[in-house]
């Protein structure tokens, strides 16, 4: 577990430093003035497209190199046998991952350095876009199981004292949005939902019999303390292991 936390600590430092660089250069600054599209909200279409990230106009290749080196050094990812991939290949991989709406790193997939690093390169761009757009999105206008900013699937949830909704955390841009209290955000099935609380009662594992997916949740019904949800996602990795051992799917 300590090894996992150490890896993500280094990864986040790399990504956050690059995001700070993007912010300083005013990359994606135009999104501050971009209107929230009500038609997209009504149709369930995310506000940001891949082209909106304008990756061609920024030095992301340095970020890719740092992430790839970290993956090769600290994970089971193997260094590619041939020369470094061309920028066009990396962008194509990033586009495919963005369009698929899946988490930036897939679970249960072969350890492919190029694809894994290409996905992780997206994080600073998506997080920066989320910071510009999410505060201006009317939560009551969005009732979907995917993120209104980038279209990502949720990786975590928070159960509040309010009986009608919970908060979902995007697995890609760290955006947070409201979703109904009951029902699966992945397949939208309202029935066949079960949750298993941890011994402490602080967390719940929601599972959907219809699509076999699971979602970790933090029970905040009796607490109003501030919690960092991306950190909560990492600190509950034992729940992921237990769920997958039982055959439940992350996505």
Go through the PLM ranges and name each one.
Residues 11, 122, 147-150, 170, ...:
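Generic structural hydrophobic/aromatic packing signal, biased to beta-strands
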Residues 1-134:
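N-terminal alpha-helical interaction blocks
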Residues 229-251:
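Hydrophobic, glycine-enriched assembly/anchoring segments
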Residues 48, 77-80, 104, 139-143, ...:
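Hydrophobic transmembrane signal anchors and adjacent membrane-proximal interface regions, especially
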Residues 157-236:
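Accessory, usually C-terminal, subdomains that scaffold auxiliary metal cofactors
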Residues 114-132, 139-167, 178-193:
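Short, charged low-complexity linear segments at domain edges
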């Amino acid at each position: 577990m300590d090894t996992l936390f150490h890896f993500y600590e280094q990864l986040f430092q790399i990504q956050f430093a690059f995001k700070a660089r993007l912010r300083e250069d005013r990359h994606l600054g135009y999104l501050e003035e971009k209107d929230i599209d009500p038609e997209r909200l009504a149709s369930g279409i995310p506000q940001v497209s891949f082209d909106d990230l304008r990756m061609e106009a920024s030095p992301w290749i340095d970020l890719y190199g740092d992430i790839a080196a970290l993956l090769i050094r600290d994970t089971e990812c193997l260094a590619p046998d041939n020369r470094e991939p061309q920028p066009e290949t990396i962008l194509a991989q990033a586009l495919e991952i963005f369009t698929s709406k899946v988490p930036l790193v897939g679970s249960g997939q072969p350890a492919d350095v190029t694809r894994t690093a290409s996905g992780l390169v997206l994080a600073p761009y998506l997080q920066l876009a989320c910071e510009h757009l999410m505060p201006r999105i009317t939560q009551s206008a969005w009732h979907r199981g995917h993120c209104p900013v980038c279209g990502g699937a949720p990786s975590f949830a928070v159960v509040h004292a309010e009986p009608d909704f919970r908060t979902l955390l995007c697995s890609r841009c760290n955006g947070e949005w409201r979703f109904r209290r009951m029902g699966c955000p992945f397949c939208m099935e309202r029935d066949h939902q079960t949750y298993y609380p941890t011994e402490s009662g602080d967390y719940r594992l929601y599972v959907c019999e219809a699509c076999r997916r699971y979602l970790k949740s933090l029970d905040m019904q009796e607490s109003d303390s501030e919690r960092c949800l991306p950190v909560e996602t990492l600190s509950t990795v034992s729940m992921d292991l237990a769920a997958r051992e039982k055959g439940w799917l992350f996505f």
